[in-house]
Amino acid sequence: MLTLRPKAEGGFTCAIGIGGIGAGIMYALAGEHELGRNESRLGELLDARDYCKLHIVGHYIARLMGSDRAPESFRVWPIGVVGEDAVGRQIFAEMSAAGMDMQFVRSHPTLKTLSSVCFIYPDGSGGNITSSNSAAQALSVDDLTAASPYMKAAGARGVALCVPEVPLELRRDFLDLASDYGSYRVCSFALGEIEEAKRMGLISLTDLLALNQEEASALLGDSPGQVLDADLLAERAARLTANRPQLRMIISAGRKGAYGVECGKSQFCPAPVLQPMSTAGAGDALLAGVVCGLAAGIPFIAPNESGRSFSSQVLRTALELGVLNASFSVTSTHAIHPDAALQNLFAFAELHGASISESLWSVCHESMRISADNVSSFT
């Protein structure tokens, strides 16, 4: 199986993360207009699997980095809480099968596994509603403490993933730990969390910040509810990162592609023209692809490049790998594409006219699957 090779010098060898672990259902709404505050609307219950953020990001990282392969492969440790229910057991098994080490995921005796309802419009866009009283909210400082020796041992070679669907206060504690140990701190925030995250100083504890257009507008805009043009957001992000040289930003522009910004400079990577099956999980797939590229030691962006079409791209940056992964992800009805694998991504890129650079090929290798005996058991 083709995977990316983690790079100890100039890249990363493991990821430890907190965020939502759970599952949900998807509805395809009838009609293009946005769901109203007091509206009841028919929708088709889809035969599609929805998942929560840490699971999605962790799955793609584990698959693309070959975490279920040789013992020296990239390690992924999620930290979280699920319910003692069928959904929790199923999610645990799926994450373990993808190659994640589940020793820091525990079950709660009374609270249910995090669940969500995703709704999709006919054009493939949509949103979701996620339970706020699930087992995920029971994540505690003790859970972080249990994983802290691994964070300390990894040091600057470790990625600290900090994504939504767990309390902001715990995310602050996690980022403080990551800062103490020199981890590379990767964050995303839901739209409704941006102001509180700013107030709590979480942005200043971030090395890589991934936002969609609405979330970036809340961070960089002039007034609440205003959604800025993606080009303008990239300009403002460039000004922000010029003053914060440690901060990198990913700004998704939806079906158009994504921007990567660092040190006052940016790159725009266009996405292939597609009719998406579902955009659920696409932003998480984008983030995961970028993290994988950085772990393999390829550049985050090619500064001041702006591709006109995906078909003309020679893929060589972490941003471009992220856009490729996100684009591939929307060809599935599921929030995690069941066929996510590096060789499939490369074939998809070539099918849509892009090519893989020699520098990207050079950080890939064929890896052998490890024994199932090394997979943690659910307790």
Annotate the PLM regions:
Residues 79-84, 102-113, 190, 250-253:
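Beta-strand->loop->alpha-helix junctions that form or flank phosphate-binding loops
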Residues 1-19, 194-195, 222-379:
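Conserved phosphate-binding/catalytic region of the ribokinase-like
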Residues 156-232, 256-257:
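Conserved beta-alpha-beta core of the PfkB/ribokinase-like small-molecule kinase fold
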Residues 18-20, 80-84, 107, 120-122, ...:
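Cofactor-binding loop segments of dinucleotide-utilizing enzymes, especially the Rossmann-like FAD-
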Residues 1-93, 97, 276, 356-379:
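Glycine-rich phosphate/adenosyl-contacting loop at the front of the ribokinase-like
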Residues 115-119, 127, 257-261:
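Short beta-strand scaffold segments in enzyme catalytic cores
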Residues 103-109, 118-159, 164:
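Conserved phosphate-binding/catalytic loop of the ribokinase/pfkB sugar-kinase fold
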Residues 14, 104, 207-208, 248:
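Well-ordered beta-strand positions
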